[in-house]
Design a protein with these regions (language model features):
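Short, charged/polar, Gly/Pro-enriched secondary-structure boundary elements
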Residues: 23-24, 46, 136, 215-219
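Short, well-ordered surface patches within globular domains
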Residues: 55-145, 181, 187-199
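A well-ordered secondary-structure block
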Residues: 141-242
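Generic detector of short, well-ordered, non-transmembrane alpha-helical segments enriched
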Residues: 13, 104, 122, 172-176
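Generic structural signal for short, solvent-exposed loop/turn connectors between secondary structure elements
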Residues: 12, 27, 33-36, 130-157, ...
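Extracellular adhesion/carbohydrate-binding repeat motifs centered on closely spaced tryptophans
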Residues: 1-56
């Protein structure tokens, strides 16, 4: 559970930015000088370092060991360059990916289905898979998840193919190539993750993964997860310096 009301004007709140050429003490007097830090629940994070970590800096706030998902020991590991602007792990690409989950849930709502929660782990898995699939041009099959993939220009909506075109085929009794559509409307799926990579020779690579296996502390409502992400995103890119 995250307290979105914890934005304070001093270091006593859950969230604050303290910067400028000042000494800042926390948790027993550890001090920093001349930089800007994000403070979350008593722990300070250097903003420059967090930007370099891209989405992983955010994912680690929920699960400190999640970076291990990007080091699976497969050759696919090489395709993730954490924090790179065109990588699925860039903060901006993660922000864009969250819109994909919103769109998916709107489509599910039209079928009377429950909203998919966002899994922090599935966000990491989607980023890893999508980075690799930008080169492999196929599913890599490392993780046991349902997956939709698409390649196309940045202005293209992957749901035009995954949902609109495949639903039309399904409704006409053409069932040969409707797997993406069926993933979207599968009522056994309860959680999801989404990613966008900009490295593909065909433009962007879009990837969405699905599962019905929820882990405690890993799954959140869309409102809670997106709200927490945007607090972090805005704090990192538009810090309000206090003090």
């Amino acid at each position: 559970d995250f307290d979105f009301n914890g934005i304070a004007s001093n270091s006593s709140g859950n969230w604050c930015i303290w910067g400028g050429k000042v000494n800042f003490g926390y948790d027993g007097g550890v001090k920093y000088l001349g930089s800007t830090y994000l403070v979350l629940d008593g722990e300070a994070f250097c903003i420059d370092e967090q930007i370099g970590k891209g989405s992983v800096g955010f994912l680690e706030l929920i699960n400190p060991t999640i970076s291990g998902l990007f080091k699976c020991g497969y050759a696919y590991d090489q395709y993730t360059v954490i924090g790179a602007a065109d990588d699925a792990t860039s903060l901006e690409n993660m922000r864009q990916a969250l819109y994909g989950i919103l769109e998916c849930n709107e489509l599910r709502k039209a079928h009377g289905l429950q909203e998919l929660k966002i899994s922090n782990s599935l966000m990491a898995i989607a980023e890893y898979d999508t980075n690799a699939s930008a080169y492999a041009m196929d599913h890599i099959g490392v993780f046991n998840v349902g997956e939709n993939l698409a390649w196309g220009p940045s202005f293209w909506d992957p749901f035009d193919g995954w949902y609109t075109q495949e639903k039309a085929d399904f409704d006409q009794g053409n069932y040969a190539n409707v797997g993406h559509y069926l993933n979207i409307i599968d009522d056994s799926y309860t959680i999801t993750g989404f990613a966008v990579n900009q490295k593909s020779a065909y433009g962007n690579t879009y990837g969405q993964v699905f599962s019905g296996m929820e882990l405690e502390g890993d799954c959140f409502s869309v409102d809670d997860y997106c709200g927490f992400f945007m607090l972090y995103y805005n704090a990192v890119y538009n810090p309000v310096v206090l003090g």
